[in-house]
C-alpha cells in the first residue's frame, strides 16, 4: 500500500532545479493531476518558507498539481491531513527533523503514508524517510530530540552518495564513513543513492530509477 519515491538530489549535472525528476514524478503521480501536495520546507535553512514553496511550485508546475507548504496552515499538520500527496524538500536534515518533531508531524505523516498517501522527498527529504538520520551527510547545526526519523522505510538512506575519494581530500571517503556506522550498528542496512538516482518503493518492493543504481551496504 505504501508508495514512495526517494530522490538523491534536486539537481543532476547541469540540469535545473528538480528538472531531472519531472518525468519520474509525472509517472509516480499520474493519477493525482489536479490534486494537492503538502510540501514540508523545514530543511531549507538559507531561504524562507515562502521562498522555498515558490521555488518548488515553479519547478514542478508541469505536474499540474496544487503545491501548498505546511506553514500555510493554522497548525502545520492541518495541511498534511488535507493533502493527497506529501513531499519533503532537501537542505539540512537536522533542521528538518527537529521541526518535524516540533510541529508534531511525525505521526501524521507516518499514518498517512502507511495508509497509501504517496510520499516523495529529495536529499534530506529522502534521508528522513528512513529509520534514522544517522547516515546523513549534513552538519548537526541544531539538535533534534531524537535521530529517529519517519521510519517509512526500515533501513538507512544516504543521499548524494559518491564513491571513492575526491582529489586533494585527505579525510574519510563516504564508504569509510558508512563503514564506521555499520561497525557501530552491525544489523543495519544502508541504501546509498548516487546523484541522479532514486528509489521507488511500492508494495514492499524497491526499484531503481535513474541512470545509476543504488548501493546496499551492510
Curated annotation (Swiss-Prot):
InterPro entries: Class_I_gatase-like (IPR029062), Peptidase_S51 (IPR005320), Peptidase_S51_dipeptidase-E (IPR023172). GO terms for cellular component: cytoplasm. The keyword Calcium does not apply. It catalyses: Dipeptidase E catalyzes the hydrolysis of dipeptides Asp-|-Xaa. It does not act on peptides with N-terminal Glu, Asn or Gln, nor does it cleave isoaspartyl peptides. Keywords: Cytoplasm, Dipeptidase, Hydrolase, Protease, Serine protease. Its EC number is 3.4.13.21. It is found in: Cytoplasm. One of its GO terms (biological process) is proteolysis. SUPFAM superfamilies: Class I glutamine amidotransferase-like (SSF52317). The active site is at 123 (charge relay system), 138 (charge relay system), 160 (charge relay system). Pfam families: Peptidase_S51. GO terms for molecular function: dipeptidase activity; serine-type peptidase activity. It comes from the Bacteria. Hydrolyzes dipeptides containing N-terminal aspartate residues. May play a role in allowing the cell to use peptide aspartate to spare carbon otherwise required for the synthesis of the aspartate family of amino acids. Belongs to the peptidase S51 family. PANTHER family: ALPHA-ASPARTYL DIPEPTIDASE, PROTEASE S51 ALPHA-ASPARTYL DIPEPTIDASE. This is Peptidase E. It comes from Haemophilus influenzae (strain ATCC 51907 / DSM 11121 / KW20 / Rd).
Amino acid at each position: 500500500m505504501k508508495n514512495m519515491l526517494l530522490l538523491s538530489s534536486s539537481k543532476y549535472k547541469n540540469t535545473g532545479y528538480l528538472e531531472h525528476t519531472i518525468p519520474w514524478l509525472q509517472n509516480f503521480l499520474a493519477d493525482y493531476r489536479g490534486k494537492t501536495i503538502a510540501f514540508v520546507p523545514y530543511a531549507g535553512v538559507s531561504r524562507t518558507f515562502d521562498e522555498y514553496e515558490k521555488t518548488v511550485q515553479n519547478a514542478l508546475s508541469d505536474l499540474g498539481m496544487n503545491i501548498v507548504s505546511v506553514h500555510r496552515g493554522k497548525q502545520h499538520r492541518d495541511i498534511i491531513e488535507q493533502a493527497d500527496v506529501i513531499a519533503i524538500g532537501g537542505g539540512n536534515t537536522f533542521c528538518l527533523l527537529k521541526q518535524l518533531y516540533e510541529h508534531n508531524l511525525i505521526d501524521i505523516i507516518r499514518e498517512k503514508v502507511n495508509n497509501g498517501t504517496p510520499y516523495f522527498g529529495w536529499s534530506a527529504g529522502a534521508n528522513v524517510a528512513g529509520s534514522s538520520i544517522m547516515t546523513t551527510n549534513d552538519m548537526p547545526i541544531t539538535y533534534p530530540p531524537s535521530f529517529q526519523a519517519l521510519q517509512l522505510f526500515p533501513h538507512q538512506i544516504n543521499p548524494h552518495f559518491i564513491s571513492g575519494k575526491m582529489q586533494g581530500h585527505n579525510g574519510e571517503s563516504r564508504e569509510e564513513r558508512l563503514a564506521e556506522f555499520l561497525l557501530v550498528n552491525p544489523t543495519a542496512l544502508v541504501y546509498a543513492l548516487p546523484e541522479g538516482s532514486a528509489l521507488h518503493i511500492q508494495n514492499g518492493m524497491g526499484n531503481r530509477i535513474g541512470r545509476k543504481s543504488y548501493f546496499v551496504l551492510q
